Swiss-Prot record:
This protein's encoding gene: gatB
NCBIfam families associated with the record: gatB (TIGR00133), PRK05477.1-2 (NF004012), PRK05477.1-4 (NF004014), PRK05477.1-5 (NF004015)
Protein name per the record: Aspartyl/glutamyl-tRNA(Asn/Gln) amidotransferase subunit B
One BP term from GO: glutaminyl-tRNAGln biosynthesis via transamidation
KW Cytoplasm (keyword) present: no
Species for this entry: Sinorhizobium fredii (strain NBRC 101917 / NGR234)
First-tier enzyme category under EC: ligase
Record-linked InterPro entries: Asn/Gln-tRNA_amidoTrfase_suB/E, Asn/Gln-tRNA_Trfase_suB/E_cat, Asn/Gln_amidotransferase, Asn/Gln_tRNA_amidoTrase-B-like, GatB, GatB_C_1, GatB_Yqey_C_2, Gln-tRNA_amidoTrfase_suB_CS
GO molecular-function term, one example from the UniProt record: glutaminyl-tRNA synthase (glutamine-hydrolyzing) activity
Amino acid sequence: MSIVDVRTPDPKRFIPGATGDWEVIIGLEVHAQVLSNSKLFSGASTEFGNAPNANVSLVDAAMPGMLPVINEECVKQAVRTGLGLKAKINRRSIFDRKNYFYPDLPQGYQISQYKDPIVGEGKIIISIGPDRQGQFEDVEIGIERLHLEQDAGKSMHDQHPSMSYVDLNRSGVALMEIVSKPDLRSSDEAKAYLTKLRSILRYLGTCDGNMDEGSMRADVNVSVRRPGAAFGTRCEIKNVNSIRFVGQAIEYEARRQIGILEDGGTIDQETRLFDPNKGETRSMRSKEDAHDYRYFPDPDLLPLEFDDAFVEALKTDLPELPDDKKDRFVRDLGLSVYDASVLVSEKAIADYFEAVAEGRDGKIAANWVINDLLGALNKAGKTIEETPVSPAQLGGVIDLIKAGTISGKLAKDLFEILWNEGGDPAEIVESRGMKQVTDTGAIEKAVDEIIAANPDQVEKAKAKPSLAGWFVGQVMKATGGKANPQAVQALVKSKLGIEE
């Protein structure tokens, strides 16, 4: 298969070396565990965290005479993913045996797909930025293919001083291997691609994307070249289980290869691993080619065939995906591209925002969700699923502001109370005397006292009207933030003789 270079060299992404500029070429092979209750070819459970070898059937253990039976739900999940990636769905695909020996691969081969995968070419649009002007750059990254395959088991080397144990709980679990084209040109692009892909999978409900549990991991192919030259020799960094680590591995590996080439050496095609503790890649073995695996069609499995009606039925039931949701937020709610991008980055955040925004001003709801809620969650190290403030509670805060019951400052205090103690926003405002002061007489008295106590500041404000804001701040402080800010501002300007 020939590899086509579709990207025009971009000087913004060049890496400066001692002898000139270099360009890094990146391709990603993402292994995403299919969200399914049972494995690809057996009825064994896929539940994470069970005791070793608790989720193992006779098929998973490769007992003699046991034959694989395809899990239809895994097939549907792969097709849904292909549709979400705007990819070609192949109506006929074939399962192959990929032959190699690992202690945790009991069959002595892995059932995968080689020449005829279930999903063909697709694409993902990633956004890079914002730059100093606040602009985003959209980049199209090609998808080469998506195929279904079995996961292997896990060798455990820390259970006994002189022996290794094997846990087959993951053996036979369905994986989607999603292979990008070599279209990525920086570690930032690679991280953006993985973030976007994970978001799409979560929206579709085809993979939970939990990299810390191993349900999504990446093999990272890296090579370097002079800008515009032919592709260089690539190295593959296996099983990187964090988006941040993927970025670090690419940065290190690109520098390593550039250093070798600038010293007159050559790059060996090899498989490497990333050590996150040292922030470096290390050689594991020479890189295999396809012929080393001796692929051939699995004689125990018929070709996988389905018609247009099968695909169309799945397409009809697809949820709204991140890009479409972002466009709707910008178009219908008037959000900025940046705010909409933040809100759709995770399905749970988008769902929370939509619950808050329903029947309310979308921009105000977005401001509270992004700045106050997500800010508090980040500070506390919590996820949106762990938020102590429900959409109904946050919506209640916004309603109280709109009704003029509380000021913006008091709303911040109310949010803190909800975060720490919970409760009903309206009841808290009532019981704690947090209602905004709208009585003009009470506000006027406070304004008069501040003006009388600061004659020097009065003269300055008359000479420079913008300084009237100082008086507004002092009145708000004197009233504990309860005064209506608009009423205070109008009274201050009136008392100082400043025209609106």
